[in-house]
Amino acid sequence: MKKIYLIMILFFATASGVFAQTTNIVTLMLKAKSGEAEAQNALGEAYYDGKGVTENLTEAVKWFTKAAEQENAKAQYNLGICYYYGYGVQYKDYGEAVKWYTKAAEQEYAEAQNSLGYCYEFGEGVDKNLKEAVKWYTKAAEQGLPMAQCNLGVCYKYGNGVEKNLEETIKWYTKAANQEYAQAQYYLGKAYDKGDG
């Protein structure tokens, strides 16, 4: 008898969770269809991750685009990611990715600033420009984004777009490492091992 009660409790707990999730998606869809940019981006993320709906990258791009065109920085960044990797679009398009990263980066969206810096560093979708890469990495790093802090540290280590400066290298690696960013922790350990720190 206890097994039956336990099974019923588990069933209803699961069913109520599914019901709540379905209700949230329906509400999100209604808001997105009414033109709310944040809801459009959130719905795009739901389709991208397959949370509450079946994963559908084409639908994700559709909703990211609607929100991005309303100047939603997170959606612009998400759309840039889709074009960069070719998710939900016909093919990878670095130029289109840079366009959307730039729009989000100009709104101080740190992840987009870092991604834009990466594109400039490696000449993906834009002409290679190390000074421009450093500019965008710095903006994101100053906002506390550990990946950008690590990338900026690498630029200072090798003199990419800035004058070589081991003190700055260690400073930025340390900031990223203190946020548990594994790559920066590795680089910092290597620097101390070589006596650079």
Regions of interest found by a model, annotated:
Residues 4-14:
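Sec-dependent N-terminal signal peptides
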Residues 7-8, 18, 29:
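Cleavable N-terminal signal peptides
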Residues 29-30, 58, 65, 95, ...:
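Alpha-solenoid helical repeat scaffolds
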Residues 33-36, 49-51, 56, 69-72, ...:
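Short helix-capping/linker turns of helical repeat alpha-solenoids
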Residues 42-49, 78-85, 90, 115-122, ...:
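Hydrophobic face of amphipathic alpha-helices that form TPR/SEL1-like repeat modules
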